[in-house]
Amino acid sequence: MRNTMNLTNLLAPWLDCPELADITVQSLELDSRQVKQGDTFVAIVGHVVDGRQYIEKAIEQGANAVIAQSCQQYPSGLVRYQQNVVIVYLEKLDEKLSQLAGRLYQHPEMSLIGVTGTNGKTTITQLIAQWLELAGQKAAVMGTTGNGFLNALQPAANTTGNAVEIQKTLADLQQQGAKATALEVSSHGLVQGRVKALQFAAGVFTNLSRDHLDYHGTMEAYAKAKMTLFTEHQCQHAIINLDDEVGAQWFQELQQGVGVSLFPQDASVKALWASSVAYAESGITIEFDGCFGQGRLHAPLIGEFNATNLLLALATLLALGVDKQALLDSAASLRPVLGRMELFQVNSKAKVVVDYAHTPDALEKALQALRVHCTGHLWAIFGCGGDRDKGKRPMMAEIAERLADHVVLTDDNPRSEDPTMIVQDMLAGLTRADSAVVEHDRFSALQYALDNAQADDIILLAGKGHEDYQVLKHQTVHYSDRESAQQLLGISS
């Protein structure tokens, strides 16, 4: 049963409006196009759009009331009517949105785990949810690959949805029996206060490397945004990757910190660390030690960074009191995440690994991880997104040339930019222009690699991962790296 509240009570922490008590709020909506009869429209000044421009449209759609961000003309506390629909103004509404939505949808009584960092968020949230399910606790995720239970994810437009969507989704998940939800928390989401009112049982920091500089401007601003999960949000435990330079620095400053490392730490440090790690085609075997005692686990995942991801997920669940033996016994049943170092293979052809790596750091880690498993030549196929940080294009090409034996440059959501110009930016990072082949069509790029690779080669198809679209200048078309790999290898999906 969906919660309802009268408008007076909803606004009570900020405004005294007894005259609004007869207006029932049953659902909040930020997008005027999505307003249905009886919804309450919330008009905030967003990063790109000013929602107040769409008040009239929302009323025409059937909004029963409007809560709008105040301005000089309409100060906070003002109540006015338009076409017999009440509009009430509230200052800094964009900052209050998470709390406002939380009051209506009731802060869900479940364990919330927030995961932030440049890379690894999706894998860690899904490992946490998988592991909890294996331990007998119903768990959900919210993030890049969708929201909900792992066997029934609903598509998500952004890594971290808007503040209203988050509260609404959490209330729905709780109603469906979720005892815990692991959320990917993006830097955009933190800066814009989308998770401001959530109480996190644990926060996890994965790593920090170049990304989203088109939004944040500098690495310092980007790091500061990530740090707020632990300093400005309610976060009981902070699980920090000590092998990341920024993480090691933050760990010194956070009282609630639990460190995680692939290298032995001093016994006085509150941390979980690997005493030995073994990589094989069947997966990763880790022996660990530290503040949660000793243990050994095996999981069918590939690569050094997945050893870190496993330990971060393990430390989080141990900090939350999940039984250690239950976690170690079930680790072998964990599964790779869709489009994250996902292996496609058949006899007598090169292996294809599909991964979401679309930053310099992620590409470097993916290639280094595969080199350990590769007995033949290593191939890298990737592109760079249009209308995004141009500085990373030559960096990614330099990494591919250095770490792979063969490089194929292709398109990856060129958006409004000319794909040939994006490739030119990438080529600038190469020491030799002839060390890369250019094939703009991703399917053809993979076909070229498979035609020229030997059976013991590994082909990394990087950048899109779980995505099933390609964003062009005037349209978005269906395209999937996973489907391309299955089709070209003759694997039935």
From Swiss-Prot:
The modification N6-carboxylysine is found at K226. It is found in: Cytoplasm. Its cofactor is Mg(2+). The keyword Cytoplasm applies. UDP-N-acetyl-alpha-D-muramoyl-L-alanyl-D-glutamate binds at L30, S32, N158, T159, T160, S186, Q192, R194. One of its GO terms (biological process) is cell division. Keywords: ATP-binding, Cell cycle, Cell division, Cell shape, Cell wall biogenesis/degradation, Cytoplasm, Ligase, Magnesium, Nucleotide-binding, Peptidoglycan synthesis. Its EC number is 6.3.2.13. Carboxylation is probably crucial for Mg(2+) binding and, consequently, for the gamma-phosphate positioning of ATP. Catalyzes the addition of meso-diaminopimelic acid to the nucleotide precursor UDP-N-acetylmuramoyl-L-alanyl-D-glutamate (UMAG) in the biosynthesis of bacterial cell-wall peptidoglycan. This is UDP-N-acetylmuramoyl-L-alanyl-D-glutamate--2,6-diaminopimelate ligase. The gene is murE.
